[in-house]
Amino acid sequence: MKVLFINLDKGEYKISDIDSQGIISLGLKIHNEYESWKKDIYDPSVPFIFGLGPFVGGKLFGVHRMVAIFKSPLTRTLHFSSIGGVGYKFMGSGIDVIVIIGYSKEPSVIFISPDNVKIESINYVNSYKNYKGVYAFSRYLLEKYNDFFLNYNARAVVVGEGSVYTYNGNLFSFDIFNREFRMGSEDFSGRGGAGSSLFKGHNILGIVSGGNYKYRYEKANDFQLINKIFLEKFGKGYIDVINEKTKKYKYDPETKSGGTFGENYILYKELLPLFGYKSIYYPKELRRKHYENIIELFWKPFQEEVFIKSKSWFTCGDLCNVACKKVYKGKKVDYEPFHSLGPFIGNYIFEEALKLVDLVDQYGMDVIEVGYVISWLFDLVENKLLGPGEIGLNEYPIFNFENFDPKNDSYKNSKIAEKIIEGLIKKNNEILSLISEKGIRVSSKILNEKYKERIKDNKFNDYVVYASFGNEGYITPNLYWSPGMVAPMYILGKYWTDYSNSFARPEIFARSSYGRAINESLIEDLGICRFYRGVYEPVLDKLYKEITGKDLDKNLYKEIAEYSIKANAEPVLWESKRAMDLVSTMCRELNSNDWKFEKYEDYVEWWKEFKESLDKYLGLKN
C-alpha cells in the first residue's frame, strides 16, 4: 500500500510502500508502532489514519469506502468509522492511506493529488450562500479551490462545529459532479468521534483528494475472473448475486420499499427501541399501538414520497447499482439517524425528525449519539433528577410511554430537542457544556455526585443505555433491541456483533457475536460496504487470493482486542440498569429458558461468561 505520512509539526510529508492486508490492518500496525495506546486521545502524536482497501478502481462494486482509524474520544481505544464512496475519488491521488501526526499551527485543509501535497491554512466557514454548517464549508472549498476539484476530479471530507466544540464530531463528504453537489451522494463517518479526533488532535478541518489513478491490482479489473468466482460459489453471475443479496437496500418487491428506513420499520415492528429504550419494559400490545402510529405518521410520508411519487434513489458516489440512498425532498434518509431523532426521543412526525437530523448533520455530529443524549435528558427531567431550567429549557418534554399523544407531543418534543442540540454546540448551559466535553458516561458520574441527594432508586447513568470500556470509555449502541449491542465485545457502536433480536446462553451468544465480528472486521478492512456483506463474505478468501495473490489473515479482531487491553479500554461490566435490562427483557420477550435474570448476580454471571467465552475463542489469555 502507498502510504502518505504527513508531519504537521514539521510541515513535511513522505510516501512509503508498506505491505498490508487492508486499511485497518495497516492502521493498527501504525498505532502500535507509535504506542498510541498509552497516550491521551487528543495527543498530536497519536496518528489519525484515513485510507481505502485493495479492491478499488476495477470492476468490483461497493469497495470504495474509506475508513478512519483513530483513538476514539468515546471508547478511549481504537475505533473504525467508514464513509461511503469517498475512495472512488480519493484513489485517484495514487495514495492508499493517509497518516497524520502533529498539530497544525493554524486550522488547515490538506490537499492531495498525484503532483503534490499542500497544507492550506483555512478558517472554518459555517454559513455560505444558502448553505449551513458542513454543507457551507464544503461549498466554500468547492468554489474557492474550483481548479483543484476540476483538474483532479477531487472530493472533500470535512469536519464541522461538532468536532470543534464537542467529543462527538464526525466526518462529512458530499460527492461532486459537474461543479455541483450530487444529490443524495452525501455520507458521514458517524460513530466514535472521528471528526473530533482529527480537529482537536491535529487542527485539521478537512482533506481534499483526487487524480486519475485507478486499480491497484490488475485482476480487480478482470470481470471474467470475478464473474467466474461467483458462478463457482453461487451458481449464478456476479450481477445476479448482487441483485439478490442487496434487495433490502435497493428495492424489495415484497415490501414495495427499500433502504434501511423503508425496510426496518416493516421488519422490526414492536421490537423497535422507543423512548430511549423505555419501550422494552412495556407489553407487546402497547408497543404495537406505538408502532401503528409510527407507521402512519413517520413511515408513510417517506414511503409515499420516495417510492410512489419521486423514486429518488442514489448512490454514495461508489461504483454501485444498489442506490441505497433514498432521498426525501433533497435529504438522504436512513433508519438510524431518523429513528434517533424521531421515535427514540418521542417524536413521531417525520418532517420534524427531518429538521432535527438536518440540523445535527449541519453541525457535523453523530446523530445516533445526539439521540441518546436527548432521550437521556428527557428521561432525567421526567424522573425529576433534573429540572428543565437546569438544561436550558423552559418547558417539560413528554416522555411518558403510557400517556403519549403522537401528534401534539411529538411537535413539543421536537422543539425542545432542537434547543438541546443548539445548547450542545453553544455550551450556554453548565450541564450541556459538561456533556459536550465529557460525553455521557463521565458526565453521568459527575452528575451522580453533584445531585446525590436527588437519587433514590436509579442513578443518572441508569436512564441511558451504553457499553463501558476501561475507566472512562463507552459507546451507545446502534438502535436495535439486541443483547449483542451491549455484550462485552471489544468494538461496539457498529455491527461487529450478533445484533439479531435473539437470546442465548452467553457462551453460545459469544460464539455468534465472535463470528460476526471476524467477518465484519475483514469486510471493513478491505474497504467494502457492509450492505454487500451477503455478496462478498462467502467468497472473500477466494476473491482476495485471486486478486492480490495473498491469503486472508483472520487474526485482525484478535489484534484489535490486544490493543484495547494495552490501552486499558477493554469491556467492563455494565454500569447502566437499562443496559442490563436490554438483555433480560429480550430473554423475557422470547420466553427463553436459557437464563434466569432474578438478581444482580445473574446479570454479572451472564456478562462474565460471555466475556470469558469470547476471549477463549480469540485465544486471549485471561
For each predicted feature, which ranges?
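N-terminal basic/disordered segments at the start of proteins
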Residues: 1-36, 91-92
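Conserved short S/T/G-enriched processing/targeting/catalytic segments and their helical context
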Residues: 22-77, 101, 341, 358-361, ...
